[in-house]
């Protein structure tokens, strides 16, 4: 079981708004989708990281179990979300 956290990073002079996604296994930033609301942007970014982690597992020969989001909630400070991921047997 792992935790993924997401947080919003506003635009700078060189980069647009994005969601920062952090986990023990990997950290990434994903661009903000202006067609989605804030909650959906965080959820999509977390799922994108899960997809990256699963691709890494397949490359390493561990395709029998895949990461999947099993629970989600907002952070206590209100500055992002937390997602619990666990390895689930691949179908």
Which residues make up each language-model segment?
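Catalytic phosphate/metal-binding cores of nucleic-acid and nucleotide-processing enzymes, i.e., regions
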Residues: 1-91
């Amino acid at each position: 079981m792992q935790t993924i956290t997401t947080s919003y990073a506003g635009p700078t002079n060189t980069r647009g708004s994005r969601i920062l996604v952090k986990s023990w296994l990997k950290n990434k930033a994903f661009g903000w989708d202006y067609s989605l609301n804030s909650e959906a942007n965080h959820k999509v970014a977390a799922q994108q990281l899960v997809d990256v982690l699963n691709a890494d597992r397949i490359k390493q020969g561990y395709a029998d179990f895949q990461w999947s989001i099993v629970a989600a909630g907002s952070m206590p400070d209100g500055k992002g979300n937390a997602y619990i991921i666990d390895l689930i047997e691949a179908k």
